[in-house]
């Protein structure tokens, strides 16, 4: 049994969870999330909790047990609080701005890079160098933040580029030169 999968998912007051076979729908104050879960796992809704259990004792069911519990917990957290990822842009002349809903990043290329957000994702820019990606789906928020970071990943010599707010860049020493 999975240690993560054993613990039930608590459902807050303003959240409703609908279980229709393998389709789990979570509705809350921030929105609605729907997800098709993998086979080999069953769901039981008791009072204000959802209990996930494997249908068989095969390895695939046991592997998906903890995964499905974590996915449902992330869905519940997303519709109540939401998720956000912060990025920092480091470097002279590198900056970001929001035009309409789109994010425009100037990162040292000959052209600015425009990012179009998927449904449910919002971009927020503070002081031209701090970007916040927020939404209710943890997976999509993380993917969008990774796409923005991939425009100009941080380089190890001067640390220029786009990095996550809490990311530490491993710095390398430059050439030592002749002595």
From Swiss-Prot:
Q: Could you tell me the keywords of this UniProt record?
A: Ribonucleoprotein, Ribosomal protein, RNA-binding, rRNA-binding
UniProt-recorded Gene Ontology molecular function terms: rRNA binding; structural constituent of ribosome
Is-annotated flag, keyword Ligase?
no
Q: Which GO terms describe its biological process?
A: cytoplasmic translation
Q: Which Pfam families match?
A: Ribosomal_L6
Keyword Ribosomal protein in record: yes
Taken from the UniProt entry, a GO cellular component term is: cytosolic large ribosomal subunit
Task: Show the InterPro entries listed in the entry.
Answer: Ribosomal_uL6-like, Ribosomal_uL6-like_a/b-dom_sf, Ribosomal_uL6_a/b-dom, Ribosomal_uL6_bac-type, Ribosomal_uL6_CS
Q: What does this protein do?
A: This protein binds to the 23S rRNA, and is important in its secondary structure. It is located near the subunit interface in the base of the L7/L12 stalk, and near the tRNA binding site of the peptidyltransferase center.
Q: Which family does it belong to?
A: Belongs to the universal ribosomal protein uL6 family.
Listed under subunit, the entry gives: Part of the 50S ribosomal subunit.
How is this protein named in the record?
A: Large ribosomal subunit protein uL6
